[in-house]
């Protein structure tokens, strides 16, 4: 009953946000609202089903979740019910699970190594494995069991539907591989890849599996020389994964977050940075380090020679085009891409070893995730930056002045879903002088193209059902000056969803009609934490909240990595790769410049005092900011 009420309230908020006049909705709008409610109800039923099953002490067979997956009709899995493989969904899943999943039949979930050990699993002694496109700590026992560390409920909302989707597609392939006995025999022939016969067999197998040449090539990129052996593993066994949750509690998630924070707090103390102003950035661990340290730029000649050797044909071609002016890309971005690839070669090992030392000399310290959450972090001491080493695009007049007392950046690899709330809350609990919170992450765009950059000033959080209205500190001009391939979409509305597979077409259509065009997973949880940093109560549920004025800077940037309205163009079908660096770095540069300009000017000191005073006045008044429903005049967004 409560879930239905929350769903209706959410639908009403979506209608109000779209500007629909109360009591005057047309018949088709009513039908759309009902369709949205039905889509939401099926998603909620799916979530409740697996959450209920995971509360038990035993193992859960995922076969029992297949029908709920079908009913939810995930937009990421449009042909789940079809007999032919959904290659987009299949590729999405294998990119987000370790390759050891092909050898596994059981998956264990736990919050800490102590929890695993208490249940008889010494996972730290197992083989550490990783997925290509999802950061998570995985361990494989070498037989048939995978273990994953979970940081929040968002991890279960991610892992469970992904495993169910893989099982559905696995069993389609299993049936097709065994429909004709000669298919498995062909794969068992072990023909050399260089042989002409290999290409002929591949063509026959590909056509029998209904896989396009383009998708087959993607499988070759993911599995390399193991495409045939991977298909053999699928063909030999019909899959019914079992899943077991070991313990799992709210306190456990809090404990994991504090264990994650421990090494960061220790380094803060060792570097004596505790009394300095702090800027929190959620992005990745390569962007700011590259922009601030200059390690790649100082090796320009070395990296250029590496690119032109042809070890990577793409780098070779792109380097030549950039050199002769026939490619529109940015040379600095190219160097960062080349440096990443160079570090992976034997010739680049000297660079890989010296890089951390050079970065630390320039104030960039790396804190790898060893305990708790699998979220790497960086501490960047702005007082140690060397202006001549900065990327030219972030250089700011005045950086050569005395730097004593300058701020510190805490930069983290962006977390998944509700882990964002726990991370930012931990930071805000432990550091008093936070001057800015800047969030950069991937998102689905409903009205743009892959590589576009979106700036939102409204965020609807599906977790808390809160709608946040904020004054985003970034504008289109901050991004567009360094964006080559994409476009900047300003004044967007974002919705933070529960998971990639927990969205369906009715869900997305309803939000799109209500002008919500950015779909992601972290902004809402981050804003829930911001709420708790300025009020004496926990974040509410189902409220409209005005963040137009805050005691610190707030910026929100997303770059489009997914377009669900173009079938097959999700992250499973193609990744941002080199071209995605364009939007990522344009956004990172905007964040870096924003921070450096504040440090140099010092002009925001008075503004911060004014905002703090305004906040104090509001607290002494209503106690609930923005309790009324925003109207059509875009309240909640302060004029610049």
Residue ranges and their predicted role:
Residues 2-626, 630-631, 635-640:
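Accessory terminal and edge-of-domain segments that mediate assembly/interaction
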């Amino acid at each position: 009953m409560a879930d239905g009420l929350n769903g209706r309230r959410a639908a009403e908020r979506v209608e109000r946000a779209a500007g629909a006049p109360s009591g005057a909705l047309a018949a088709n709008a009513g039908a759309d609202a009902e369709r949205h409610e039905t889509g939401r109800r099926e998603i909620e039923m799916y979530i409740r089903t697996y959450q209920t099953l995971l509360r038990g002490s035993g193992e859960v067979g995922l076969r029992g979740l297949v029908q709920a997956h079908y009913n939810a009709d995930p937009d990421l899995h449009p042909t789940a019910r079809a007999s032919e493989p959904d290659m987009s969904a299949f590729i999405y899943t294998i990119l987000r699970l370790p390759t050891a999943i092909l050898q596994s039949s059981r998956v264990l979930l736990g919050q800490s190594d102590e929890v695993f050990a208490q249940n008889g699993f010494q996972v730290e002694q197992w083989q550490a494995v990783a997925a290509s496109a999802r950061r998570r700590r995985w361990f494989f026992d070498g037989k048939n069991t995978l273990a994953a560390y979970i940081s929040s409920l968002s991890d279960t909302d991610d892992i469970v539907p992904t495993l169910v989707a893989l099982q559905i597609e696995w069993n389609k392939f299993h049936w097709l591989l065994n429909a004709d006995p000669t298919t498995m025999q062909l794969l068992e022939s072990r023909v050399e890849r260089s042989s002409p016969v290999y290409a002929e067999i591949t063509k026959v197998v590909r056509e029998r599996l209904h896989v396009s040449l383009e998708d087959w090539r993607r499988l070759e990129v993911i599995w390399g020389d193991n495409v045939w052996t991977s298909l053999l593993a699928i063909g030999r066994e019909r899959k019914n994964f079992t899943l077991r949750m070991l313990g799992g509690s709210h306190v456990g998630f809090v404990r994991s977050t504090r264990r994650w924070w421990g090494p960061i707090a220790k380094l803060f103390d060792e570097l004596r940075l505790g009394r300095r102003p702090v800027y929190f950035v959620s992005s990745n661990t390569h962007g700011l380090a590259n922009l601030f340290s200059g390690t790649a730029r100082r090796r320009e000649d070395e990296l250029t020679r590496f690119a032109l050797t042809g070890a990577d044909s793409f780098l070779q071609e792109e380097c030549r085009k950039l050199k002769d002016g026939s490619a529109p890309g940015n040379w600095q971005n190219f160097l960062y891409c080349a440096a990443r690839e160079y570090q992976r070669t034997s010739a680049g090992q000297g660079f890989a070893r010296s890089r951390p030392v050079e970065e630390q000399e320039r104030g960039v310290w790396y804190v790898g995730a060893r305990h708790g959450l699998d979220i790497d972090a960086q501490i960047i001491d702005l007082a140690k930056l060397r202006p001549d080493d900065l990327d030219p695009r972030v250089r700011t007049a005045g950086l050569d002045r005395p730097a004593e007392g300058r701020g510190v950046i805490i930069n983290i690899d962006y977390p998944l879903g509700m882990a964002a709330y726990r991370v930012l809350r931990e930071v805000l609990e432990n550091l008093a002088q936070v001057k800015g919170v800047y969030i950069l992450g991937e998102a689905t765009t409903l009205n743009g193209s892959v590589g576009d950059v979106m700036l939102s000033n409204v965020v609807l959080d599906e977790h808390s059902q809160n709608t946040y209205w904020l004054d985003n500190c970034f504008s289109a001009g901050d991004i567009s000056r360094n964006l080559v391939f994409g476009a900047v979409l300003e004044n967007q509305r974002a919705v933070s969803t529960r998971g990639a597979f927990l969205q369906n077409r009715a869900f997305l259509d309803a939000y799109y009609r209500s002008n919500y065009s950015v779909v992601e997973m972290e902004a809402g949880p981050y804003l829930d934490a911001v709420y708790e940093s300025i009020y004496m109560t926990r974040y509410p549920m189902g409220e409209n909240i005005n963040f137009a004025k805050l005691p610190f800077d707030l910026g929100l940037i997303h770059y489009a990595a997914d377009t669900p309205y173009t079938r097959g163009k999700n992250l499973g079908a193609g990744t941002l790769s080199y071209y995605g660096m364009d939007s990522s770095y344009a956004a990172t540069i905007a964040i870096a410049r924003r921070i450096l300009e504040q440090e140099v000017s010092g002009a925001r000191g008075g503004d911060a005092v004014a905002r703090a005073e305004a906040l104090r006045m509001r607290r002494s008044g209503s106690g609930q900011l923005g309790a009324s429903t925003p109207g059509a005049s875009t309240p909640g967004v302060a004029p610049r």
